[in-house]
Amino acid sequence: GVTDIPKTPDEFIDALKKIKDKTDAIPLYTNYAAGWTMGAWDAYIGNNATGDNTYFNQKFLHTKDPFKDYGDGTHPYAVYKILYDAVAGGLTEDDYSTTDWEGSKSMLNNGQIGCMVLGSWAYPQMEAAGENADDIGYMPFPISVNGEQYASAGADYSYGINVNASDDEKQAALIFVKWMTEKSGFSYNEDGLPVAKSSSDTKLDFSGVTFLEDEPAVEGEEDLLNALNADSELNVNNGGNDKIQAIIEHAANGDESFDDIMNEWNQKWTDAQESEGVEITE
């Protein structure tokens, strides 16, 4: 069986094969039909796949052929290839068009599904979907960069206090915000990282994993990613769910290789870079 958390794409695919061979569970459930669930794959191409918190908002914009194979199981190519290989290898549901997002929660809870690719926000929903919350865990994305694993950390919705409120209202609001962030335990209950700097309480077992927070775009390029996404129509990490669905379709039908898909994406990105006059730095 699977005794260790997989840390590389090869280890992850091997674990999926063991689930298929030794159980009746669906190894990896794609949630293709929901559409929006596909966006989770885009979220892992930055910090998780490169170990570089300047990659997604800065270097990615200037990289030549960012979807190329780096040959070491890292970068965007490695992220999307996991999905392609899992589908092509029969390690996902039999019919991707009939997946059911709401139903998948209880299926994971009761052991009918081995794993799904989702953000940590979904973890408590899976726990609440049945009687087997203790059987559910949340693992880092299975990519290692020079032997190290990385995960993205990001703030949730922020709190604001109305500048036009009365002094008493502002004081009451501040007390509420401090209670929410320091005393309520909501981040722990929602399986997130603690808000309070002094706290280390979390259900996530990410020991040995380095958390990174994306650096913003450099000055003058705040809108460049949006422009490249629009020009290329790839919409990376911006609702480009159809391109991820296409990976599943081609892998299932066997009518286009993964490298051909990535070559198409590289060409679209190159054309967009040329349209926007982007300097290619690597």
Give residue spans per PLM region:
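Glycine-centered hinge/linker elements that transmit conformational signals in sensory
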Residues: 14-18, 60-96
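Stable alpha-helical elements in mature extracytoplasmic
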Residues: 8-15, 37-41, 76-83, 104, ...
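Extracytoplasmic/periplasmic solute-binding protein
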Residues: 13-65, 113
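Flexible glycine/proline-enriched surface loops and loop-helix/loop-strand junctions
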Residues: 22-26, 58-69, 88-89, 155-160, ...
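Aromatic-glycine-rich donor-binding/catalytic loop that engages nucleotide-sugar donors
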Residues: 1-5, 89-91
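C-terminal lobe and pocket-closing loops
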Residues: 119-132, 144-243, 276-282
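Short helices/loops that flank or line small-molecule/ion binding pockets
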Residues: 14-21, 102-116, 246-254
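Extracytoplasmic/periplasmic substrate-binding proteins
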Residues: 40-41, 48-51, 78-169
